[in-house]
Amino acid sequence: TNEFIYTLNENGEVLIEIVVQSGQYSGVVSLLGTFNIFPGDFISDVYDPNDDERVITVFFPILRLPDLNPHTDLINQVYEVSRPIPNTGLISSQGDFAQNSDIARLGWKLSGKDVKIGVISDSYDRISGVQNSLGDAVVRDIDNLDLPGGANSVTVLQDYPLGAASDEGRAMLQILHDVAPEAELYFTTGFVSEGNMAAGIAELVDAGCDIIVDDLTYMKGPFYRDGIVADAVNEATSLGVSYFSSAGNFGNRSYEANFSASASPNGIRHDFGGGNSLQQLQLEPGQYIIALQWDDDFYSLGS
């Protein structure tokens, strides 16, 4: 099973999002109860407490998925929760030197003191999976002064809860500690779902973060309007938080056009040019994710 498409657990369950028909949240909760799934099993994705009844994120038995099909009176749609794409490069960072922040610290006595910085990425301490104490890699980073320790240790609001991950968030925090060694550093995962990431942004704001950075892109996020993550970012910046994202520039990896009907009898097909309703793609061997979107409403976003 492709881990870039599906998130599975050891119980034969897949992580899904259930888009609830308007006003039917309690009905869906009752329905899930017949599968022995209860609100305590839901993944935390409450960004706006006044608007938490559109989407339920939960692990669901794979073999029982067809049993949801008859309940269109309660459920608008169900889809898998795909992991976001981390925008990481192939070269080790020399960010402190490249942006001359090392010179700024010397010339203006800047250290990041009294500044809170939040990081959103896949994980902080999950390279060996979920564990109850600090992993060896984190302890080593603190001992090597790559991360702050003692009273100024990184505050982890939520680490990735679903198994092992790459700890890219810890790598980002190492860079920030180089640049601003006295800053207070915070981390939360954004690797569970869009709703969970949006909730994480709000939690970092509530924690008093002055700056938030992330390196994630959700391919299912709306292309033609703001989604729940963008709404959370907009709310953060409206409160004075500086937000920086390496969301990725996919412009040169995409195709966008207004619909142009093909000639009869294929009028419902898009004409890519020259009467061609089939766009040819040449791909090298490997794994690819192709995302298609139309400028339509998103029911899960209330439109």
What are these regions (language model features)?
Residues 1-166, 171-178, 184, 215, ...:
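Autoinhibitory N-terminal propeptides
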Residues 164-178, 182-303:
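Substrate-binding/access-modulating region of protease and related hydrolase catalytic domains
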